Amino acid sequence: MSGAESFVPAPMYLTDAAAQRLGALVEEEGNPGLKLRVYVTGGGCSGFQYGFDFADTVGDEDTIIENGTASMVVDALSYQYLVGSTVDFEEGLAGARFIIKNPNATSTCGCGASFAV
């Protein structure tokens, strides 16, 4: 028996609030196959930034996270920065938006759209 331990990354989560809002947006679009694509790109004031888009296709390397009938998709490169994260939806004085609570981020910008690892 070897002393090596296997590593299983923590999954990502889509909160009920985010799933409800996503469901409403998909219904407005009239395409029940749409999913929320969450991705990470270089840039922003902290080094990386989050992005959101609709996707109606899923790549071979994509990970699908579901909550009820709502689904989000994350590409393999972005997933490594988002492991263990929670995607939520909030409404407040700053407006309504999807947000990411990322335990891997060592710092974030004031608006929460960019982060550093």
Swiss-Prot record:
Keywords from the UniProt entry: Iron, Iron-sulfur, Metal-binding
Superkingdom field: Bacteria
Cofactor binding note: Binds 1 iron-sulfur cluster per subunit.
GO biological process: iron-sulfur cluster assembly
Regions that span the bilayer: none
Cofactor(s) this protein cannot do without: iron-sulfur cluster
Residues that coordinate or bind iron-sulfur cluster: C45, C109, C111
GO molecular function per UniProt: 2 iron, 2 sulfur cluster binding; 4 iron, 4 sulfur cluster binding; iron ion binding
Function according to Swiss-Prot or TrEMBL: Required for insertion of 4Fe-4S clusters for at least IspG.
Subunit structure comment from the entry: Homodimer.
Family under the similarity heading: Belongs to the HesB/IscA family.
PANTHER family: IRON-SULFUR CLUSTER ASSEMBLY 2 HOMOLOG, MITOCHONDRIAL (PTHR43011:SF1)
Name of the protein: Iron-sulfur cluster insertion protein ErpA
Organism: Chromohalobacter salexigens (strain ATCC BAA-138 / DSM 3043 / CIP 106854 / NCIMB 13768 / 1H11)
Lineage of the species this protein comes from: Bacteria, Pseudomonadati, Pseudomonadota, Gammaproteobacteria, Oceanospirillales
Name of encoding gene: erpA
